[in-house]
């Protein structure tokens, strides 16, 4: 049921152009798109190319073409993070003026023996929190992490995180001058008026930091829903690094049917022989977030876990 008193729904899909879309990317796109359309809301598209060393030339255009081929329709023009550096700089300067960030001289080697944070990274020990050591220059700028962050994930349920002990002071401006993902995504979501974020559970560990930044910058906090991450038969997340096959080579209607099945929507077998248009129509009408499996990851069905250069012959 849609709450008429709630603000207009604005969702988004924000792929990184580090390679072509794979089945895991498709699942995230399908989940966010259907939740937006089922709420009669907007679905925005953002290309997260702020991390220029990871950006592959031509990948963004390939992503846009694949989404169009699969029948996705987004609202407004795609937003490119590389065109929004001034907005990130303004947000960073606000944090610095408020004393919420500090320069850090620590290298990865110096932090190698630190305790592990919740997401598997090294927990920052606070070495530079009260000033740089004599003779050292800043390699990055970090946010002073403090307090507990709690939120109700629409799929994964109640979440709580102590920033100081489970995350530590986190980077918002890197030594190479690149703004960190956490800052860029928060600024972009606020600028677009995003009310609901539906994405993979691999980003669940980033949510506490993003809510923290929203509080510091005076931004509203969207509702969050984290879908199970798609993994291959070895239990690895589908990605460029694990040689996930591009979905562009797959029949769109069959791939969409598989994504709906993965998301617990229980599409009828006859839909597997329907056209792409008919499949989308059924999916929007029957979308149910409560039926999405409440788990952090699940294996891709059959040939959809195939590696690049393998032939998905079962399709």
From Swiss-Prot:
SUPFAM superfamilies: Nucleotidylyl transferase. One of its GO terms (molecular function) is zinc ion binding. One of its GO terms (cellular component) is cytosol. A motif ('HIGH' region) lies at residues 15-25. InterPro entries: Glu-Q_tRNA(Asp)_Synthase, Glu/Gln-tRNA-synth, Glu/Gln-tRNA-synth_Ib_cat-dom, GluQ/Sye, Rossmann-like_a/b/a_fold. Zn(2+) binds at residues 104, 106, 124, 128. Its cofactor is Zn(2+). Its EC number is 6.1.1.-. Keywords: Aminoacyl-tRNA synthetase, ATP-binding, Ligase, Metal-binding, Nucleotide-binding, Zinc. This is Glutamyl-Q tRNA(Asp) synthetase. The gene is gluQ.
């Amino acid at each position: 049921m849609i709450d008429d008193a709630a603000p207009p729904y604005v969702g988004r899909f924000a792929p990184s152009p580090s390679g072509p879309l794979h089945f895991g990317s498709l699942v995230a796109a399908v989940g966010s798109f259907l939740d937006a359309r089922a709420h009669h809301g907007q679905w925005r598209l953002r290309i997260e190319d702020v991390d220029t060393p990871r950006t592959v030339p031509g990948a963004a255009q390939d992503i846009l073409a694949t989404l169009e081929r699969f029948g996705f329709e987004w609202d407004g023009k795609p937003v490119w993070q590389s065109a929004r550096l001034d907005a990130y700089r303004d947000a960073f300067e606000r944090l610095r003026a408020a004393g919420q960030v500090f320069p850090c001289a620590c290298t990865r080697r110096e932090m190698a023996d630190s305790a592990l944070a919740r997401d598997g990274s090294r927990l920052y020990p606070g070495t530079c929190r009260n000033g740089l050591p004599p003779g050292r220059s800043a390699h990055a700028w970090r946010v002073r992490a403090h307090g507990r962050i709690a939120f109700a994930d629409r799929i994964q349920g109640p979440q709580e995180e102590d920033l100081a002990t489970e995350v530590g002071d986190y980077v918002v401006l890197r030594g190479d001058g690149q703004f960190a993902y956490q800052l860029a995504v928060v600024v972009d979501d606020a600028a677009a008026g995003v009310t609901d974020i539906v994405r993979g559970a691999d980003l669940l560990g980033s949510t506490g930091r993003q809510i923290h930044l929203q509080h510091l910058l005076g931004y509203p906090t969207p509702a969050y829903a984290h879908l199970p991450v798609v993994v291959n038969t070895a239990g690895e997340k589908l990605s460029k690094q694990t040689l996930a096959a591009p979905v562009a080579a797959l029949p769109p209607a069959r791939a969409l049917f598989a994504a709906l099945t993965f998301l617990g929507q229980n599409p009828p077998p006859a839909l597997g022989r329907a056209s792409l248009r008919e499949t989308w129509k059924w999916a929007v009408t029957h979308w149910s977030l409560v039926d999405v499996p409440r788990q952090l990851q699940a294996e891709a069905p059959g040939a959809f876990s195939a590696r690049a250069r393998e032939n998905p012959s079962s399709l």
